[in-house]
Amino acid sequence: ITMHTWYEQAVFYHIYPLGLLGAEKTNTLTETAHRLRDLEAWIPHIRALNGSAIYIGPLFESSTHGYDTRDFRLVDRRLGTNEDFAHFVQLCHENGIRVVVDGVFNHTGREFFAFQDIREKREASPYKDWYRGVNFGWGSPLGDPFGYEAWQGHFELPCLNLWNPDVRQYLFDSIRFWVDNFDIDGIRLDCANVLDFGFMKELREKTSAMK
């Protein structure tokens, strides 16, 4: 008998929440907009299509399109709160739908805490090895007082150093946070074609033990 994992047989429905819910293109909100609550009405529609899983993302606090992450453990204020998303996942599970989120692990936004610390403290920053190609001998085209490797030359997306054990642990802890607080069922890897294979192998080992 051939055993299949649930995702091999699932019918996925893809949601890009910032677009579907009409969020502002730039995150300048001072208050939270509870747009995720509007997604709850989509659950019966997805079930009617025989959907058994939702791939949703990016979800977490970012400056613009969702892939320039500010905070891996906070739902984007343009979408709602952590509690809003946890409730959405709960409703999905009650309707037999699993939830997979976007894992944006190749890079962050420039407003991410580690990047901001390097901007402020330069060589004295404990996070100076969290990004690839950090060079204090030149500045970025965006005015940062150091250079760094950026995803496909987009300097608003500085590349994380996934060979750094501290970076890996931070990301693994963030995933544990998602499992504990949202009860997610899986992760889609953004930019998987450029992720370090060793990181992905360890990621698989760590997450298999989480749920």
Question: What is the meaning of each model-derived region?
Answer:
Residues 1-211:
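Active-site and adjacent substrate-binding regions of carbohydrate-active enzymes
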